[in-house]
Amino acid sequence: MNDVSKTGLPKAIFLMGPTASGKTALAIRLRQTLPVELISVDSALVYKGMDIGTAKPDAHELSQAPHRLLDIIDPAQAYSAADFRRDALQAMAEIVAAGRIPLLVGGTMLYFKALLEGLSPLPSADPTIRAEIERQAAEQGWDALHRKLQDIDPVAAQRIHPNDPQRLSRALEVFFISGKTLTELTQTSGEALPYQVHQFAIAPASRELLHQRIEQRFHQMLASGFEAEVRALFARGDLHTDMPSVRCVGYRQMWSYLAGEISYDEMVYRGICATRQLAKRQITWLRGWEGVHWLDSEKPEQAYSDVLQVIGAKQQ
């Protein structure tokens, strides 16, 4: 398999999909038969000490197929799409320099988009404006601020849930700083990706099956010690619910349980529901994605063969 395309650009492979869709298993198999190196594209897997609730590949899987961009920051640190793009481009260049092909696998669609299309220059955070937004939220509630965003930027308001204060605050902040909406600014893409990319999306054909998998996996996480993992983070004392790490699906629900805000059963219910909602958002992103080849996760042999056929590799 040639690692340079007919266009003269180096090849890269994107393997995208919702949570619990079998991405990791397929990526590991491809790693065993193709000259590829794996790069994780997941905003939760970057955090150290967050292994069970993120379904991070285990030691055995990583010994078969090492992943770059896993365990690179502490949960107290921030990691943006711009940080990811910088780190992924560096990793891709190193992989190509070694004569291999980058295989990027994960479910953080914003990261894939940032890598593929580049990032528009958004204004830096302004603590004064951020504080004013927080003050208004305390007085009027986040629902009122969501209605305000609907007037300013209806496209962003449709995408951002009223219960997501972090993204809601940022959308308003960008407008108050720049006078331009988040939608306007993000339509101006930055530098495109200098690779010929083969894009794949893997998911079960049935939504019910995906929901069933999500529920099973959440219970497996609990049986594997997820509560103890989050309890250790909770006990640190320097983490709080405004941080992206604590807001990860599953973690924020367990955090609420440990804080005494909800019962154990409610935590399980909310955790499963939140994971299903995440999967729905991921699939919605992918349905609007251009140039993607769909793979059925319930037919792993066929999915594997389809990837090889599209990228022009011989069946192993």
Swiss-Prot record:
GO biological process, one term: tRNA modification
Superkingdom classification of source: Bacteria
Binding site for ATP: 17-24
EC code: 2.5.1.75
Nucleotide-binding is among the record's keywords: yes
Reactions catalysed, as given in the entry: adenosine(37) in tRNA + dimethylallyl diphosphate = N(6)-dimethylallyladenosine(37) in tRNA + diphosphate
Region Interaction with substrate tRNA: start-end pairs: 42-45, 166-170, 247-252, 280-287
CC cofactor: Mg(2+)
Keywords linked to the UniProt accession: ATP-binding, Magnesium, Nucleotide-binding, Transferase, tRNA processing
GO function terms (MF aspect): ATP binding; tRNA dimethylallyltransferase activity
Residues at which substrate binds: 19-24
Gene3D superfamilies, alphabetized: 1.10.20.140, Crystal structure of tRNA isopentenylpyrophosphate transferase (bh2366) domain, P-loop containing nucleotide triphosphate hydrolases
Site (Interaction with substrate tRNA) location in chain: 108, 130
One Pfam assignment: IPPT
Enzyme class name: transferase
Role description: Catalyzes the transfer of a dimethylallyl group onto the adenine at position 37 in tRNAs that read codons beginning with uridine, leading to the formation of N6-(dimethylallyl)adenosine (i(6)A).
Subunit structure and binding partners: Monomer.
Family: Belongs to the IPP transferase family.
Name of the protein in its database record: tRNA dimethylallyltransferase
Lineage of producing organism: Bacteria, Pseudomonadati, Pseudomonadota, Gammaproteobacteria, Enterobacterales
